[in-house]
Structures are given as C-alpha cells and as structure tokens.
C-alpha cells in the first residue's frame, strides 16, 4: 500500500504593520538607535531632575568653590562632576539644564512646524499670488544668517528665554514652509486629490485631511533635525547673554558664566560643552535614522 504525501504549502509571510515596518528600517541604522537611546535617557533625566539631581541647581556651597570632579585629587562624592565658581553642583545644573534645553527644543519645533505647515499648505495648494507672496518672504528670511537674525530679534525685544525661543521659532519657520510646499506640489495633482475635489471637498479638507498626511515623512525628519538646531542655537544665545539669564541652569549660560575659569577649572566648561555636543549629535543621528525609515527611496 502506497502512501501519497501531500505537498506542504508555505503560507505567505504576514505583512508588517506600519509601526513594525518603521522599526525594521530604523534599527538598521545603529547610530540612530544609539541616538534614540541617548534622547530617551535625556528625557528621563529632564523629567526626573527633581528626584535624580543631588542638589538644587541654585544651591551654593561656599566652602566648596571650584571643587574638582570626584576622580580628581580634591574631589568629593558630594559633587560628582565638581562645582562652579560660586559653589553650585555642576551635575545638578546639567540635569536641570537638560529640562530647559529639551523644553525649548519642543517649543521651537512645535511652533515652527505648525506655522510652517499652514503657510506651506497655503502656498502649495493655492499657488498664484499667495504662493509668490509667501515664498518671497521666505526667501528674504533665508537670505539672512539665522543666528544673526535671532540675535537682532532678541536684542529688540529684550534678552529672555521666552524671547529667545520665539526668535528661534521665527528663524526656523522658512525651512518648514519650503519643505511643506515642495511636498504639497507633488501631491496636489494626484488622482485622489482630483477625485476629492470633484466630490466637492472643501479646500481646508483637501489640505489638512487629504494632502497633509502624505507630506508628514519629510516633516518628521526635519523636526528631528530642527530639534538639535534649536538646542544648539539656544545654547549660543545663552552663551552670548541673549538667552536664559543667570542663575537659570541653561547649558549655554553655564558656559558663559565660567569662561574665565576655563584653564584653571576645566570641568566647569567641559561638561556643559559635552552635554551640548552629545545632545545635538544624538538628535542628528536619530534624524538620519528617521529619514532612512520614512523615505521610500532609501528602503529599496
């Protein structure tokens, strides 16, 4: 008696969800994963600074002025990264400074992204006079150095963390306008937009419901890179005395306050500088990974 073996049919692999597909391509970029881990760590530190920081950011220890880090001769576990010229704990101020830097980055990116998307949609969808007017203003703004323009705005309205954030929002706005407009011009003549227009969809529905979701990928990447630019520019404004004012624990202001001690007490300038460097680098690496994961051309 012969046995007939039935052929085994392998089932097709289950398609990945959008989130699974995103993570599949994102994790290929090891630098992006490292950057994301660092950003998550910074978020935890910023949120839990009240609990994690060993001291208050403005607390002064007059008997421990310019105390070196714990691993250097004269250091103490009470001040792991040393103290500054008035006896404030460097580690605690770095932790609270992370909160302020990330908060400013969120504010600048959120405001510039929302306004840039609105103006970019208007320019790309309506075209004509609206497009010419918006894009000529954008061209004028881009013709000026961004940091110089921010400095002028802060000088006019007065140095403060709020005015510096609004100035950085203003100088970041043109990049989102141009990017949104370019993406809209690609989508506006596609069949689904034409069909929706024939069906009687309003201009607002066309822009914000039909077109905008298909333009989000490059905007997400730009927002990630804009986050690092906002942190770096805020540190530059703080260093020049036009951002956060002492004794606010902001990384750029920390550098400016102790610059005269750079040679005698290296730690007071090194650690804030390293914090700025690593944070900006982490957001840039993460933005590179987001581009790899969201750009269809790079997936092929």
Protein language model regions, located:
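Conserved beta-strand positions that form and line the central face of beta-propeller blades
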Residues: 25, 65, 79-80, 89, ...
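Short linear motifs in intrinsically disordered
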Residues: 14, 68-72, 228
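Short, strongly hydrophobic transmembrane alpha-helices
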Residues: 31-50, 117, 277
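Residues marking the start of alpha-helices
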Residues: 22, 77-79, 153
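Transmembrane alpha-helical segments of polytopic membrane transport and secretion proteins
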Residues: 1-37, 285-300
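Hydrophobic alpha-helical transmembrane segments of membrane transport/permease proteins
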Residues: 37, 45-83, 240-248
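Alpha-helical transmembrane segments of integral membrane proteins
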Residues: 83-300
């Amino acid at each position: 008696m012969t046995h007939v073996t039935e052929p085994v049919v392998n089932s097709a692999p289950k398609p990945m969800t959008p989130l699974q597909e995103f993570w599949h391509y994102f994790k290929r970029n090891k630098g992006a994963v490292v950057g994301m881990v660092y950003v998550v760590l910074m978020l935890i530190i910023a949120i839990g600074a009240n609990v994690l920081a060993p001291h208050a950011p403005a607390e002064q220890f007059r008997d421990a002025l310019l105390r070196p880090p714990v691993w250097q001769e004269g250091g103490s576990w009470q001040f792991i990264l040393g103290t500054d010229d008035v006896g404030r704990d460097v580690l605690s101020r770095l932790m609270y400074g992370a909160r302020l830097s990330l908060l400013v980055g969120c504010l600048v990116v959120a405001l510039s992204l929302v306004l840039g998307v609105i103006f970019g949609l208007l320019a790309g969808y309506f075209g004509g006079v609206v497009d010419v007017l918006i894009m000529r203003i954008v061209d004028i703004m881009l013709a000026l150095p961004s940091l110089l323009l921010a400095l002028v705005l802060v000088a006019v309205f007065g140095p403060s963390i709020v005015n510096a954030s609004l100035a950085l929002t203003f100088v970041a706005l043109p990049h989102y306008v141009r990017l949104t407009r370019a993406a809209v011009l690609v989508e506006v003549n596609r069949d689904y937009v034409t069909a929706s227009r024939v069906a009687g969809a309003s201009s607002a529905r066309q822009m914000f419901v039909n077109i905008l979701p298909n333009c989000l990928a490059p905007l997400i990447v730009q927002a990630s890179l804009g986050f690092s630019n906002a942190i770096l520019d805020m540190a530059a404004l703080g260093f020049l005395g036009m951002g956060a004012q002492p004794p606010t624990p902001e990384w750029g202001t920390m550098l400016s306050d102790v610059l005269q001690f750079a040679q005698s007490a290296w730690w007071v300038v090194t650690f804030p500088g390293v914090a700025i460097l690593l944070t900006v680098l982490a957001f840039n690496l993460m933005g590179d990974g987001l581009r790899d994961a969201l750009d269809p051309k790079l997936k092929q």
